[in-house]
Amino acid sequence: GENISDADMQQAADIAQATEFIDSKVDRYNSLISQGGTNVSGGQKQRLSIARAIAKHPKIYLFDDSFSALDYKTDLTLRKELSKQTADATVIIVAQRISTILHADNILVLDEGKIVGSGTHEELLASCETYQEIAKSQLSEAELAGVEKGGRA
């Protein structure tokens, strides 16, 4: 494996919101994770994977449904901290939850493998029927109203 300093790994764990559960383990950063991660929860496994990616400081990050097992608060905090760390990198997020990609610079909407929309959240709410349907099924009326007025939901 790569040589990642303890400080870089701890910073990555902080960003990935993994520090609390790592610190709760007897061996902390030296704890063994079973094959397939069966001794950690789905959300913990995702946060460990995200921390490993962050610690490597790549120029391109690809998160493929990496936030799906996280609760809303953890997802929001993690993405906020992640955006600070990845300001000079390209970040590609594959997601099914609109809340995960709400503030992305550009969102591609796929329907049956074809791109049916491209733009910001606000642009897609105004122009893409598929995105509108997804947004209405996932976001509350208050979130839709707040976002449509340029607020942060």
Where are these regions (language model features)?
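C-terminal portion of ABC ATPase nucleotide-binding domains
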Residues: 7, 15, 23-28, 80, ...
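A short, proline-enriched helix->beta-strand linker immediately N-terminal to the Walker B motif
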Residues: 55-59, 88
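Conserved catalytic loops of ABC-family nucleotide-binding domains
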Residues: 84-95
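ABC-type ATPase nucleotide-binding domains, specifically the catalytic core motifs of the NBD
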Residues: 1-6
